[in-house]
UniProtKB/Swiss-Prot annotation:
Organism ancestry: Bacteria, Bacillati, Chloroflexota, Chloroflexia, Herpetosiphonales
Biological role: Catalyzes the reversible cleavage of pseudouridine 5'-phosphate (PsiMP) to ribose 5-phosphate and uracil. Functions biologically in the cleavage direction, as part of a pseudouridine degradation pathway.
Gene expressing this chain: psuG
Co-factor remark: Binds 1 Mn(2+) ion per subunit.
SUPFAM superfamilies (UniProt xref): Indigoidine synthase A-like
Protein name per its UniProtKB record: Pseudouridine-5'-phosphate glycosidase
Complexes and interactors: Homotrimer.
Binding site for Mn(2+): 137
Keywords: Glycosidase, Hydrolase, Lyase, Manganese, Metal-binding
GO cellular component: cytoplasm
Organism this protein belongs to: Herpetosiphon aurantiacus (strain ATCC 23779 / DSM 785 / 114-95)
Length: 303
């Protein structure tokens, strides 16, 4: 039997049949600077609770897989400098080596499914990197979506990626991407990508119904619920694209590769947008947590 350490709040939720929403920990250790990372982690948990669900931030601590963190553990991840960034492939190593590890989308999905959590809120999924024809840099998040039965509530894929190619790979893996109040794929910082989805839901009940039906007939894959960033914080697509171009040039000049690419680009985006990207990231994370809680509650009520 897989050993998971459930926080008391999460244990109680399972025992009482309450809805639970998974949250990742990479945003704490690798996504945002301190103390902003700690504040957003606590805010996301508060948002999930306010929406009627129980938050379960997932991480590996000294080789033990935790589903739900204390405030002290969140503080540790916000300040520690030796935290591994974990995809699915890295979980076993971190456990065996007794290391601390922050979970990416892929690792969070894998552990959430083991724990029996159906809904997961994050900022944006990984995908096919620009220039992947040369580098073969494709996020493990996409493969995980193809095999883990978890609903991922996000603002689409991160806009630093090749969004059309990312959609193609998700289609290949049998992963539906459903727009929430939109028929267009959000581009993380921007509401518009120009990529039509052809699948739309307009409220938590519809989203829960779509997910429940996919669970029955989708062959075990996950689903992406793509939520546009809040209108008041969404950035102009042309402004974002120009900043991305400069950030990618910096990454190439610095020889950044592999798992370090996304954190580097997000940090460069913050500099290039003079902090606007961080404000948008924070707003969409909170918005996604709110939607995820509402969908989790709707799922619970439909049972």
């Amino acid at each position: 039997m897989t050993k998971l350490i459930l926080a008391p709040e999460v244990q109680a939720a399972f025992a009482n049949g309450q809805p639970v929403v998974a949250l990742e920990s990479t945003v704490i250790s690798h996504g945002l600077p301190y103390p902003h990372n700690r504040e957003i982690a606590l805010q996301l948990e508060a948002t999930v609770r306010a929406g009627g669900a129980v938050p379960a931030t997932i991480a590996v601590i000294q080789g033990q897989v935790h589903v739900g963190l204390t405030n002290e553990q969140i503080e540790h991840f916000a300040t520690a400098t030796d935290v591994l960034k974990l995809s699915r492939r890295d979980i076993g190593y971190a456990v065996a080596a007794g290391r601390d590890g922050a979970t990416t989308v892929a690792a969070t999905m894998a552990i959430a499914e083991l724990a029996g959590i159906q809904v997961f809120a994050t900022g944006g999924i990984g995908g096919v990197h620009r220039g992947a024809r040369d580098t073969w840099d494709v996020s493990a998040d996409l493969g995980e979506l193809g095999k883990s039965s978890v609903l991922v509530v996000c603002a689409g894929a991160k806009s630093i990626l090749d969004l059309p190619a990312t959609l193609e790979v998700l289609e290949t893996y049998g992963v539906p991407v459903v727009g929430y109040t939109t028929e267009e794929l959000p581009a993380f910082y921007s509401a518009h990508s120009g990529l039509q989805l052809g699948r739309r839901v307009d409220d938590p009940t519809q989203a829960a119904a779509a997910w429940a039906a996919h669970r029955l007939y989708g062959g075990g894959s996950g689903m992406v619920l793509a939520v546009p960033p809040p209108v008041e914080k969404a950035l102009d697509p042309q402004f974002v694209e120009a900043a991305i171009g400069r950030a990618i040039a910096q990454a190439e000049a610095a020889g950044i590769r592999g798992a370090a690419v996304t954190p580097f680009l997000l940090s460069a985006m913050a500099r290039e947008t003079e902090g606007e990207s961080i404000a948008t990231n924070t707003a969409l994370l909170n918005n996604n947590a709110q939607v995820a809680a509402q969908v989790a509650v709707a799922l619970f009520q439909s049972v």
